[in-house]
């Protein structure tokens, strides 16, 4: 056994587990196509100042969690992406995609990196799927993005979900409320935990989503963000809720819900799953119209999106017994050799079957027929195709259905006609 180990906070995903991931990813791709979203892939690292500018210098992500390095002593600092929205927006602006169409609907399934304390569903290298609707952030657009996210969960059969939703108002509304909240919390400085004290100066809104019961008790008496919203923001939020009602999407209004990234405004939402325990957030998102301006676009760009943690999603699906319903996919045919003398003939058979789009496996380790049959059953092959002296001479092969154990004789052409997909 090697003394090398995976880096702390990372994990290997072997083929038996990858099959479940591929199934979930296929559902995501399918739902994205229902809503006419198109996949985008961006570099795994970006210049550090992109995240400092977009996520916010006062956030925990920028302050504590980014993997940053400087490949050239005289060059710019580079960071492994801790989230996708900033990179997608950078790509959109750099590629001048707005000149092609006013609205772009993009989605991704991508690996991200953060220096977090590893725990179940929270790794230092992790995967998210998400969507960004750029060029529109109307109530209908917000509802469309939420509907797409919930559609994925529905097709996967996930239960025990709670969609929490709130409005953060405009940037100006948030600034007024931030000042009022800080003024309310200052007298409680001696009762706040270290994390909340740090947020009190940098971004007091983050204190609202503290999981510390003592802090939650203090926050329960805080002024409400709703009291600082302009009427237009309230009206817009109610319109979003109306669209969700029309689609039959259940939600809970939560005035304490805030998002951890500074670029959010107006509608914010989060999905919780009861099977994830204390850390029950599955994903979330919201509007971020001001991000394009922050990145130098010169003007706001309407935008709304979400992100869902894939590891957390897989844990929730497993705990609800939904991954066991995914049928294991083995090869269509396992070619079983009676004698190694017929290996050349068997390899040619494999080639013909594969050319006909029939997935085919063959023993390359020189095992006995009994061991080959055990392997065929272990990898859940659908059929065994037997190759021996009689089969080679006649061109007719024994084809055994490994589920029913029935066996018939078939020529290669008949096997291809029966099992071929091409």
Swiss-Prot record:
GO terms for biological process: histidyl-tRNA aminoacylation. GO terms for molecular function: ATP binding; histidine-tRNA ligase activity. The lineage of its organism: Bacteria, Pseudomonadati, Chlorobiota, Chlorobiia, Chlorobiales. The gene is hisS. Belongs to the class-II aminoacyl-tRNA synthetase family. CDD domains: HisRS-like_core (cd00773), HisRS_anticodon (cd00859). It comes from the Bacteria. Its EC number is 6.1.1.21. Keywords: Aminoacyl-tRNA synthetase, ATP-binding, Cytoplasm, Ligase, Nucleotide-binding, Protein biosynthesis. This is Histidine--tRNA ligase. It is found in: Cytoplasm. Homodimer. InterPro entries: aa-tRNA-synth_II (IPR006195), aa-tRNA-synth_II/BPL/LPL (IPR045864), Anticodon-bd (IPR004154), Anticodon-bd_dom_sf (IPR036621), His-tRNA-ligase (IPR015807), HisRS-like_core (IPR041715), HisRS/HisZ (IPR004516), HisRS_anticodon (IPR033656). It catalyses: tRNA(His) + L-histidine + ATP = L-histidyl-tRNA(His) + AMP + diphosphate + H(+). GO terms for cellular component: cytoplasm. Pfam families: HGTP_anticodon (PF03129), tRNA-synt_His (PF13393). It comes from Prosthecochloris aestuarii (strain DSM 271 / SK 413).
């Amino acid at each position: 056994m090697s003394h090398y180990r995976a880096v702390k906070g990372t994990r290997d995903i072997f083929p038996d587990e990858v099959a479940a991931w591929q199934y979930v990813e296929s559902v995501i791709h399918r739902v994205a196509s229902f809503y006419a979203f198109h996949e985008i892939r961006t570099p795994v690292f970006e210049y550090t100042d992109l995240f400092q500018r977009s996520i916010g210098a006062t956030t925990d992500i920028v302050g504590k969690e980014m993997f940053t390095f400087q490949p050239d002593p005289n060059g710019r600092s580079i960071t492994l992406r801790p989230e996708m929205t900033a990179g997608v927006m950078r790509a959109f602006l750099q590629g001048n995609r707005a000149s092609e169409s006013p609205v772009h609907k993009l989605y991704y399934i991508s690996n991200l990196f953060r220096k977090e304390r590893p725990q179940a569903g929270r790794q230092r290298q992790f995967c998210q799927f998400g969507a960004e609707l750029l060029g529109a952030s109307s109530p209908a657009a917000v509802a469309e993005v939420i509907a797409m996210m919930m559609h994925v969960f529905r097709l996967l059969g996930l239960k025990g979900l709670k969609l929490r939703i709130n409005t953060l108002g405009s940037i100006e509304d948030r600034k007024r409320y931030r000042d009022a909240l800080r003024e309310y919390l200052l007298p409680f400085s001696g009762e706040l935990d270290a994390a909340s004290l740090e947020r009190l100066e940098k971004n007091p809104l983050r204190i609202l989503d503290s999981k510390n019961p003592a802090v939650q008790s203090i926050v329960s008496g805080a002024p409400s963000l709703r009291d600082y919203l302009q009427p237009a923001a309230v009206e817009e939020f109610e319109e979003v809720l109306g669209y969700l009602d029309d689609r039959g999407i259940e939600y809970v209004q939560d005035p304490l819900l805030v998002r951890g990234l500074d670029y959010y405004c107006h509608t914010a939402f989060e999905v919780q799953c009861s099977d994830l325990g204390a850390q029950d957030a599955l994903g979330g998102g919201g509007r971020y119209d001001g991000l394009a301006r922050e990145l130098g676009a010169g003007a706001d760009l309407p935008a709304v999106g979400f992100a869902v943690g894939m590891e957390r999603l897989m844990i929730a699906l497993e705990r609800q017994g939904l991954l066991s319903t995914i049928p294991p996919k083995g090869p269509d045919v396992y070619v079983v050799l009676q004698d190694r003398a017929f290996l050349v003939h068997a390899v040619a058979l494999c080639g013909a079957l594969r050319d006909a789009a029939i997935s085919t496996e063959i023993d390359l380790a020189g095992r006995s027929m009994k061991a080959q049959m055990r392997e065929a059953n272990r990898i859940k092959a659908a059929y065994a195709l037997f190759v021996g002296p009689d089969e080679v001479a006649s061109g007719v092969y024994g084809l055994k259905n490994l589920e029913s154990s029935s066996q018939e004789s078939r020529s290669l052409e008949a096997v291809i006609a029966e099992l071929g997909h091409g």
